[in-house]
């Protein structure tokens, strides 16, 4: 990959900005060109989302758009932000497992407990294997540094909650995608302002933004082109948003890492939560309503915020 950097350096343009532009353009194009093939195969094999009582659509729609999103992110991040896979060695493996789980759920609908077990494995792989964890709450609720065991458990639970919370907001066309673009834009700008050590995370953010915009072109199109991201796409975005949130908080932890600059910000957890506030509030809202009605918090209904706004 160093040869790619050397090649890009031959162009009279700052290499970081060139990577940002190329990652956005290529991720958009890969998604944009991949989805028509996925739509064609989905229709031929009848791999479609059936309309139901809670559905916002009235006919069968292909729901494997998340496959194109994964492919685009994996290719572009591996080329333009390869440092992430050196630093977080289990990140790609986690995404591949999540892809498998998402596709299985989109095609045959997995049992909830099986999907939960898979999510725990994926989260544990990244948290323990790559040490991506919440180390401190910066004084929120009077809690500062967490011991290793508590940090691991809390981080895994956070991954599971946020991945599923993000999945829940994918109920109407464009919502999960547009919200993802907003969140990754905010994180990307924040990482850019926090110095060169975080530039790979900026490139990851622009890669995801390009990918999602390429998907939204079809998701918001007419019937012949429409496709959903499915659980594959929503879990992928939720997982990567949680990953970038924890990495954002980790910037403000004092640690000895070559090239890293220490910044002091006690409100880091609050800022990360604020960026992801919609899925968090929506999940709390539906759980409270279901418990108040003496129903299981896992029951499906139309009490989500986006359903109320329709």
Give the positions of each predicted feature.
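Membrane-embedded alpha-helical core segments of multi-pass
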Residues: 96-101, 118-133, 154-164, 180-186, ...
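Juxtamembrane helix-capping/reentrant segments at transmembrane boundaries
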Residues: 50-63, 226
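A generic, lipid-embedded transmembrane alpha helix
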Residues: 61-78, 124-130
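Membrane interface segments of multi-pass transport proteins and intramembrane proteases
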Residues: 106-111, 137-146
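Short aromatic-rich membrane-water interface segments that cap or initiate transmembrane helices
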Residues: 56-62, 141-153, 262-272
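Short acidic, Gly/Ser-rich segments with clustered Asp/Glu that frequently serve as metal-coordination loops
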Residues: 107-108, 161-183, 234-235
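Alpha-helical transmembrane segments
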Residues: 2-41, 46, 70-100, 175-310
